Amino acid sequence: MNNHFNCIGIVGHPRHPTALTTHEMLWRWLLDCGYDVIIEQQIAEELKLTDARTGTLAEIGQQADLAVVVGGDGNMLGAARVLARYDISVIGINRGNLGFLTDLDPDNAQQQLADVLEGHYIREQRFLLEAQVCQKNCQKRISTAINEVVLHPGKVAHMIEFEVYIDEKFAFSQRSDGLIISTPTGSTAYSLSAGGPILTPSLDAITLVPMFPHTLSARPLVINSSSTIRLRFSNMRSDLEISCDSQIALPIQEGEDVFIRRCDYPLNLIHPKDYSYFNTLSSKLGWSKKLF
């Protein structure tokens, strides 16, 4: 055993129960290798691992050096939003569909992870967004997002009107179905589907992508990640929401503004040594192949 990662957490809730076999295989293999292993409590209960050391996501973030997320991108997003608060590295084994954030192939995960545990890996920091919904002198509702923060109508799709301020300076007003505010990580997710640009992960930039704007002149906007975005609403005829990674919703009420900024802490991602962002674009999203 080496000292790159001594305590390893196993997390993630795959859509298909059969994928839980990966968790058990991983748990037994890591124990046999001499690592201290913490497995997420709910997973241990489902697998009936009565002798396993268990913990919540927060406890794993506090105690482990590396978290292995087993599942798809949704599992990675949900776990990583919590784990990013702590000094822990994160890597994923893909048991979902696309697996853009989960690098390890389930059929070869043990060997790939063994190489990582021996110190053969790439470390990368990805920044998150923090969204605040607040009114003057009122308590804030706060959440974070790894991919994107989306302004949209509540339950029924319709046009909404809002103003966008960047660093407290008016930028533009819009009448549209909403607005996608994306990190470089999220630029290949919902933002891409709406016509937004692809940003390489190392860029300190945020994209603002309109959703079906009722104008001929609206275009995606790329700004520095150090900027603070403020959304204002003058005529709220119906409920609006802020959605974080399509997993957490924050309702917006009359008289409230939305503030979106770069989060104070990053996500520490671990990739295999042969990881290439552009190879991932090609294999997962059909990016152009090499000609020669």
Curated annotation (Swiss-Prot):
Q: Subcellular location, in the record's words? A: Cytoplasm
Q: Name one GO cellular component term.
A: cytoplasm
Keyword entries, A-Z: ATP-binding, Cytoplasm, Kinase, NAD, NADP, Nucleotide-binding, Transferase
Positions contributing to NAD(+) binding: 73-74, 147-148, 158, 175, 177, 188-193, 247
Give the reactions, separated by semicolons, that this protein catalyses.
NAD(+) + ATP = ADP + NADP(+) + H(+)
User: Chief localization class?
Assistant: cytoplasm
Catalytic site: 73
GO MF term (any one): NAD binding
Task: Provide one Gene Ontology biological process annotation.
Answer: NADP biosynthetic process
Entry EC number(s): 2.7.1.23
InterPro entries reported in the protein's UniProt record: ATP-NAD_kinase_N, ATP-NAD_kinase_PpnK-typ_C, NAD/diacylglycerol_kinase_sf, NADK
The cofactors it requires, by name, are: a divalent metal cation
Concerning its family, UniProt says: Belongs to the NAD kinase family.
Its job: Involved in the regulation of the intracellular balance of NAD and NADP, and is a key enzyme in the biosynthesis of NADP. Catalyzes specifically the phosphorylation on 2'-hydroxyl of the adenosine moiety of NAD to yield NADP.
Protein name as annotated: NAD kinase
Q: What is the lineage of its organism?
A: Bacteria, Pseudomonadati, Pseudomonadota, Gammaproteobacteria, Enterobacterales
